[in-house]
């Protein structure tokens, strides 16, 4: 008996001391759920485990039925028919599954969402932002907004579970909205251990004296412009001549579309731009209005950097949407290499540094990439362009780097090249007489090296914060007798501390932007040109002074 007892005890000891070979326990760290989710990029919607949905196929009059399974969308095609009632906004086409009641909207360009209710081109809000339906999702404190459909918001007064959620712009997304007619768009964020509201950092649209510009396609335009491209006067939307037309003041949703007892330009059907009905040669027709898009230069969805590195901070392209990456084909081997940075200043034009092009590359060997956070990893919203031509300043001095500026024209089959998005946007050009106080803090960005001795460029976009030096400190005697001209400006990190903490540009950042906040817009003051090493304490970087080249830029863009 004692022997048997001893054997049992020994076996128990082995059981308690041997490692668990068959069971691999996973311990949760933090409060994050392990329940998988799926995100449908076509509708910008997130689905939970085992949830199903419909989405349009790329070709044919069919749609796909999808189901979220362990984080993967499993889809197959199903037949559909036209919906019995309109359910899609902004000109979307509604299709309903043949054998069950779910529906799907095929959205026109620029709109996404279950009901085509999200405007991907809306980069700012008008008025209080009550009608804002864009994709901004960052609060003023830099926090990411919570999805309106989150179960954590089910007891909040405004969530995607309200009966009138669609009307208020709420849904299965985390984009800023203003459902309660507050002063500007807001959202819920997780702060100090609880869910609370925060105003969003969404920029307000510029207010011109007549508001004769429009944002995106002008779907939300509510100004008073009333003339077409042929200078014809618009007909009132309640004119008896329009009886029988699709878009009039008598539509059930006319107020939501901006139609009424007036003749102001509107875009009720999500066309390319605002339009109106006119009489031409005694015939009723329509024409686009004589209007231009509002300038959205210098606006961005800034996200607070999370990782500090030598020379600056890792950042996201949405914080610097004007940043361009320029690549050139290798001479003796297939592939391409990163060349320099650049700055998008209009849809088809990028500024850079002249010294990047001293080898006189053929234009067809160059490529510009916009919207990329990681230098060599394609981004979800990136845009790539070949180069039509590039212009290097005729008086560029390769020894002193005086007139270190170049202009690249992007190639496109239309008059528009870069499409504006949260990842792609233009930096503002400054007024010729702009004067900023000495030591104004500005930002630079690029994919350059972390330090001069590094053999590699940065894998990810970086940003650095520097201050504008006074002209009295931007001289040859302060920079080891290097030539400094009136076409250059100096900027550097003035904080105390060792060299490892100094923000600065470095090799590979050349051609990139030095931008400063002017009237709440990031404005291009300098182009990264040259420096003495990288990140040296009390040694500023040298930038091409953009205000000296405004006429040169405009003249070359007109050619």
UniProtKB/Swiss-Prot annotation:
EC number: 3.4.21.68
GO terms under cellular component: apical part of cell; cell surface; cytoplasm; extracellular space; glutamatergic synapse; neuronal dense core vesicle; perisynaptic space; postsynapse
Catalytic residues in the record: 355 (charge relay system), 404 (charge relay system), 510 (charge relay system)
Compartments where found: Secreted, Extracellular space
Signal peptide: 1-17
Function: Converts the abundant, but inactive, zymogen plasminogen to plasmin by hydrolyzing a single Arg-Val bond in plasminogen. By controlling plasmin-mediated proteolysis, it plays an important role in tissue remodeling and degradation, in cell migration and many other physiopathological events. During oocyte activation, plays a role in cortical granule reaction in the zona reaction, which contributes to the block to polyspermy.
Catalyzed reactions per annotation: Specific cleavage of Arg-|-Val bond in plasminogen to form plasmin
UniProt main location, coarse: secreted
Family: Belongs to the peptidase S1 family.
Propeptide: 18-29, 30-32
Species this chain originates from: Rattus norvegicus (Rat)
Activity regulation summary: Inhibited by SERPINA5. Inhibited by SERPINE1.
Pfam families listed in its UniProt record: EGF (PF00008), fn1 (PF00039), Kringle (PF00051), Trypsin (PF00089)
Subunit structure as annotated in this protein's UniProt entry: Heterodimer of chain A and chain B held by a disulfide bond. Binds to fibrin with high affinity. This interaction leads to an increase in the catalytic efficiency of the enzyme due to an increase in affinity for plasminogen. Similarly, binding to heparin increases the activation of plasminogen. Binds to annexin A2, cytokeratin-8, fibronectin and laminin. Binds to mannose receptor and the low-density lipoprotein receptor-related protein (LRP1); these proteins are involved in TPA clearance. Binds LRP1B; binding is followed by internalization and degradation. Forms heterodimer with SERPINA5.
Keyword terms of this UniProt record: Cleavage on pair of basic residues, Disulfide bond, EGF-like domain, Glycoprotein, Hydrolase, Kringle, Plasminogen activation, Protease, Repeat, Secreted, Serine protease, Signal, Zymogen
Domain Kringle: from-to ranges: 124-205, 213-294
Domain notes: Both FN1 and one of the kringle domains are required for binding to fibrin.
Glycosylated residues, chain numbering: 149, 481
Fibronectin type-I domain span: 36-78
Designated name of the protein: Tissue-type plasminogen activator
Domain EGF-like: 79-117
